[in-house]
Amino acid sequence: MYQVLLVDDDLIVRMFLKDTLEWSKFGFEVAGDARDGEEALELAGRLKPDLILTDISMPRMDGIELIRRLRAGGYDGVLVALSCHDDFELVKSALQSGADEYLLKNHINEDSMCEMMQNIRSQVDERRKTMDDRRQLQALAREGKKSR
């Protein structure tokens, strides 16, 4: 099962995201949730989720700063930025910071989430395969050094 971390300062939104989708149908489970970027950064380090859905506008640390810090720290999972603002500059900033997807909260429903999750599942599968391939190459390289 792939792990999901939900990040939003609004408890109702977090509960909606948790309950709207049958996560297991896509091979995911909600591993945790956070109310701001600082809490999410700590949880992401501990849980190592494959997918993080984060609000953009939050107190203490907003979603864009969270995305920047996660990417700078080497996080290679899928990041989805959520916002209620249909603002091109905000979308652009989120994507430039390292978000893979951007979703408007007022467009979230079961159908849009299912469509997004099918796409995300493919991304997560591909990233896992790439990581596995990288680990195998590193192991082969170490073995090659030992046999010299």
What annotation goes with each model-predicted range?
Residues M58:
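Receiver (REC) domain active-site loop signature in two-component systems and cognate sites
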Residues P49, G63, Y75, L95-D100:
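As written
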Residues K92-R148:
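Interdomain helical linkers/hinges and coiled-coil/dimerization scaffolds
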Residues D33-E42, G63-L66:
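Helix N-cap/capping motif at the beta->alpha junctions
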